[in-house]
Amino acid sequence: MCGIAGTFSAKGFFSKADIQAAGEKLHHRGPDGYGFFEEEEVMLLHRRLSIIDLDNRASQPMSSHDGRYVMVYNGEVYNYVELKEKIIQGHKGTAMAEFKTTSDSEVVLRLFELHGRNFVSELNGMFAICIYDRQEHKLYLFRDRMGIKPLFWYSDREGNFAFASELKALTAFESISKEVNHESIFNFLRSGFIPSPFTIYKNIHKLESGTCLTVSRSGIEKDKFWKLTKQVDGNKLNNEKEVLVKLDSILTEAVKIQLRSDVPYGIFLSGGVDSSLVTALATKHVNGKLNTFSIGFREQTHNEAPHARAVASHLGTNHHEFIVSHSDAIALIETFFDVYDEPYADTSGIPTMLVSKLAAQHVKVVLSGEGGDELFYGYGTHNWSVRLNKFPFNTFRIPMSILFKQLSSRYKRVAELLKYDSDKTFLPEHIYSQEQYLFNFDELKNLMLNKHVSELNQFSEKYFTSFSSTFSGLQNKPSEELQSLYEIMYPLQDDLLTKVDRATMQHSIEARVPLLDNHLVQLALQIDSSLKIKNGINKYPLKKLLANYVPEEIFMRPKRGFSIPLAKWLKTEWKYLIDDYLNEKVIAEVGLFKPEEVKKMIRQFYSGDDYLYNRLWCLIALHRWLIKNQ
């Protein structure tokens, strides 16, 4: 795991000082080493976090054996041992079979030498890779198929191009435009994050997962080397025994190869199904006790520490635990907002930063359980996607919405879930947004100043059209499968994986996600929906598999999620955030919202409408970012 940055531009447009400033912004991603390459129109920078092959010979930028290619690379390719052996066996007696290091980086570069852009199909791992062809004067950038590792890029009309692992590194360039994208603000208020390929800035983009970007003197070309929506065709697996055997075998192998490391490692253990299963399988491959790390809260409604403790005790791990108070969280708020570089509202990032800090005292690599809920239907959103297509909801949806709205505030979310125009709504996105208690478009139109409403209307039409295009041809898929695909493509990548990457890298540790192993993802996409939710049990295959290692009474309980008691804290210890960022002066300064509507929302929240907490938090996060950065 590392931090990378680079430029491709007319000589002199980007200065060496620019890219060095970017490198300073990435220091936390790679405190173990620094490397720089410059030639004609190209500059490449690398900050190293040493995980595999700690020798300086494995440092980057790394050149190919003949000097034609230069690479900077962030991530890990877990099957590098097998790939290296394949190269050696296939090229015995040639320079291609000779390696100077034991690193995965050299294997990645050698594969590119042999296969060109097609090399990426061989890689099982997480990565953001940049390779410069000195002969053809071309820059190739690749992002892994699940979007685990981040990569941002900038371009202008004159052909100047720059990239970096984090947004803050690109905004360190003085010559890069930092004009805010209003559509990204609308996106944020709908989702709580800004989805790929957008960022908060107009001319800076996230490179989408499974994508290759080719930059040359003649321009930029972008193409997909792996597309999620193309992986769901064909016959589905519905034999439970067969699925469980395959799942056990593939996940066991995924955990095994992701434990490859030359530095100490451990596991984030929440006590939930996914992290417990990863921990159980990891204990089969370690000598001695495995380090596990968890976070708890004093508020018992949000405290899962006892469950993590029970799993750790059963599996015999060396368990580390930290109980979070509101004061611990307050001390992190400013850092939390700054780490993500753009508006971001997932407050589970705060406990993730705290558990990362705890882990960093003991290890340099952690395994985490992201991906299980999205691949195996673990959320309430998947249940709602089924309900909304069945009686009585599909027949009496509108009157039921009106009825639920008249009831107490605890039913407001159900009322909003049922309220949508089927001709203008991409249902999976609507379900996700309302399940998160976020704004629907009618609420946004009522909240925004009149001068922004026409722009919002145009955005809502583009929004629906974009989703319809992305998921075209999948309308006949089960509703829960479509929900899963949406959540893999957007919330998983741009919220959860972003959260884990920034939180861990802030403390210079590497997070790995075995449930997003290439082979496991392919298997999960082939499993029939009827097996993922069976007998009313979400994530049925994962729970059946976990029962082989951990007693069901430890893990069979309602899902809570890795969240903080935000609604309570915003009324007590964190009330100052509402006072500081949602007062009349700030609302007027930002110039997006009607003051009377924001005040009304705050009054309702204090009067008992707790469901408004996430909307208020989004406004706080947005206002805070705009005030600080504009």
Regions found by a protein language model. Give the residues of each.
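Adenosyl-5′-phosphate
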Residues: 1-4, 21, 172, 203-208, ...
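Cysteine-centered catalytic environments shared across enzyme families
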Residues: 1-340, 352, 356, 548, ...
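Conserved glycosyltransferase catalytic-site signature
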Residues: 104-105, 124-126, 182, 348-353, ...
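Short low-complexity, flexible loop/linker segments enriched in glycine and/or proline
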Residues: 334-338, 360, 382-384, 569-571
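Acceptor-substrate binding/catalytic loop of class I
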Residues: 344-346
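Short acidic/histidine-rich active-site segments
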Residues: 363-373, 377-379
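A mobile, often basic/glycine-rich helix-loop segment
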Residues: 376-401
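Alpha-helical "lid/cap" subdomains adjacent to substrate-binding clefts that gate access
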Residues: 394-418
